[in-house]
Amino acid sequence: MSLSSLLWAFWYILPAYFANASPVLVGGGRPIDGGRYWKDGRRVFGDGKTWRGLIGGVAIGTAVGALQYFITPEFYGSLGKALLLAFLLSFGALFGDLVGSFFKRRIDLPRGSPAIGLDQLGFLISALAFAYPVKTLDSGQIIFLLVVSPFVHWGANYFAYKMGWKSVPW
């Protein structure tokens, strides 16, 4: 696996990274679950998953993809494909995060509690799955992202914590 191939994998996943990080800045407002409870008596997702965070995160991730297209059009082939891929990566990332929150509520982890693995990789796996029909990575690139993403996630969260955007560093 060449360094170039690994860098392209990182370039590919940037919309998902930005989408996953954005809700802490643009979120708030009405919770996606509308305050509803699941059969187990716990919130479906909790107050931390909002429509503004979801829509804003997808919009920011998609905008990152558009910017990427103008920097490296050969990577995508067309603006339409770039926007579609960025949208799928962004929505997939936030869908994976939402699924993670659902499972965290089921095991009674409160909002903001860390779930090692789920927090760092759930968004990535979901983003890759959503984007699969449009553009895929090879197995080496996927393994690279599975290894590097937890460190990117932890670093981004620590940065957001130090900036005062998050109340916890995870």
Swiss-Prot record:
Keyword check for Nucleus, yes or no.
no
Bilayer-spanning residue ranges: 6-26, 53-73, 83-103, 114-134, 140-160
Enzyme class, top EC level, equals: transferase
What topology does it adopt in the membrane? Multi-pass membrane protein
Which cofactors, if any, are listed as required?
Mg(2+)
According to its UniProt entry, the function of this protein is described as:
Catalyzes the formation of CDP-2,3-bis-(O-geranylgeranyl)-sn-glycerol (CDP-archaeol) from 2,3-bis-(O-geranylgeranyl)-sn-glycerol 1-phosphate (DGGGP) and CTP. This reaction is the third ether-bond-formation step in the biosynthesis of archaeal membrane lipids.
Record's protein name: CDP-archaeol synthase
- Where does this chain mainly localize? membrane
Q: Which reactions fall under this protein's catalytic activity?
A: 2,3-bis-O-(geranylgeranyl)-sn-glycerol 1-phosphate + CTP + H(+) = CDP-2,3-bis-O-(geranylgeranyl)-sn-glycerol + diphosphate
Keyword vocabulary terms for this entry = Cell membrane, Lipid biosynthesis, Lipid metabolism, Magnesium, Membrane, Phospholipid biosynthesis, Phospholipid metabolism, Transferase, Transmembrane, Transmembrane helix
Localization (cell): Cell membrane
What GO terms fall under cellular component here? plasma membrane
Any keyword Phosphoprotein?
no
- Select a single GO molecular function from the record's annotations and give it: CDP-2,3-bis-(O-geranylgeranyl)-sn-glycerol synthase activity
- E.C. number, please? 2.7.7.67
